[in-house]
Amino acid sequence: MEGKAYALASGTIINAIATGKGSAFGLDLKVYAKVKLIDDGKNKIEGKVLDNPNIKPNLIVRCVKNTLDYFGLNYSAYVETKTEIPIKSGLSSSSATSNAVVLATFDALGEKIDDELILNLGIKSSFDEKLTVTGAYDDATASYYGGITITDNIERKILKRDKMRDDLNVLILIPNLEKNVDVNRMKLIKDYVEIAFNEAINGNYFKALFLNGILYASALNFPTNIAIDALDAGAITAGLSGTGPSYIAMVEDENVEKVKEKLNRYGKVILTKPNNDGASIY
């Protein structure tokens, strides 16, 4: 029994840590998962992160285990993943990994695809491995469904879904900066993030993304000038993704080179597109 699936990275429109409500959109960078199941009653699960053997496979093993436990099965399994998503950079690599592995396990089992169950098993696995502060329902849903999702992470509810303009390019900057997750500082900006969140609910996604990025970058001591530099070079919007250190900029074709040149001075730049199609078995 074998299953294969992929899920998407996501970029932040509103980080949910301050208010419990967030928004993200799917990016065309993927995690691919392959799961093999053996009906031997031994419940022995092994995993391998192919592109980074130094990373412990705890999350991917946990995703398979939680899925098999849900169906009351004691199969053994082997799971492997490979990724196009930079890890620990604010691009939802763990949400994407969880979604891909759980979906691949469903495929291997021949189970009917239940979107909400797959999302919840992935989130449970991230909580079990202490990889999330809020459950990251915004990231998880954008990674799974593609497009834009606006969510209440506490209630695990989707408040709104929309398509992201896929004629735009997304430039992702991975700067040489340390990650900093100071939850208390992020809670301080709650009332101001609420203003950005209302912009998102009203469909002003680019405005929301920029405001959110400035607020969280300030709270987490990341440079705020990077987003302004991107705008100066012609980006439509730009801001910190997740809790950083990545920044994302939305750019029309004619300004890609100018914005890329500007961002290059701060670190590595990746060019991708929005993805409105979401996760899939392949």
From Swiss-Prot:
Q: Does the keyword Amino-acid biosynthesis apply?
A: yes
Q: What is its main location?
A: cytoplasm
| Catalysed reactions, semicolon-separated | shikimate + ATP = 3-phosphoshikimate + ADP + H(+)
Q: Which SUPFAM superfamilies match?
A: GHMP Kinase, C-terminal domain, Ribosomal protein S5 domain 2-like
**Residues reported to bind ATP:** 86-96
Q: What InterPro entries does the record point to? A: GHMP_kinase_C_dom, GHMP_kinase_C_sf, GHMP_kinase_N_dom, Ribosomal_Su5_D2-typ_SF, Ribsml_uS5_D2-typ_fold_subgr, SK_arc
Q: Which is one Gene Ontology cellular component term of this protein?
A: cytoplasm
List GO BP terms, alphabetically. Answer: amino acid biosynthetic process; aromatic amino acid family biosynthetic process; chorismate biosynthetic process
Q: Where in the cell is it found?
A: Cytoplasm
Q: Where are the transmembrane segments?
A: none
> One of this protein's Pfam families, by short name?
GHMP_kinases_C
Q: Which UniProt keywords apply?
A: Amino-acid biosynthesis, Aromatic amino acid biosynthesis, ATP-binding, Cytoplasm, Kinase, Nucleotide-binding, Transferase
Q: Which molecular-function annotations from GO does this UniProt entry contain?
A: ATP binding; shikimate kinase activity
Tell me yes or no: is Nucleotide-binding among this UniProt entry's keywords: yes
Tell me which domain of life the UniProt entry assigns to the organism this sequence originates from. Archaea
Identify the EC number(s): 2.7.1.71
Query: Record's family?
Result: Belongs to the GHMP kinase family. Archaeal shikimate kinase subfamily.
Spell out the PANTHER family in the cross-references: HOMOSERINE/4-DIPHOSPHOCYTIDYL-2-C-METHYL-D-ERYTHRITOL KINASE, SHIKIMATE KINASE
Q: What is this protein called?
A: Shikimate kinase
Q: Which organism is it from?
A: Methanocaldococcus jannaschii (strain ATCC 43067 / DSM 2661 / JAL-1 / JCM 10045 / NBRC 100440) (Methanococcus jannaschii)
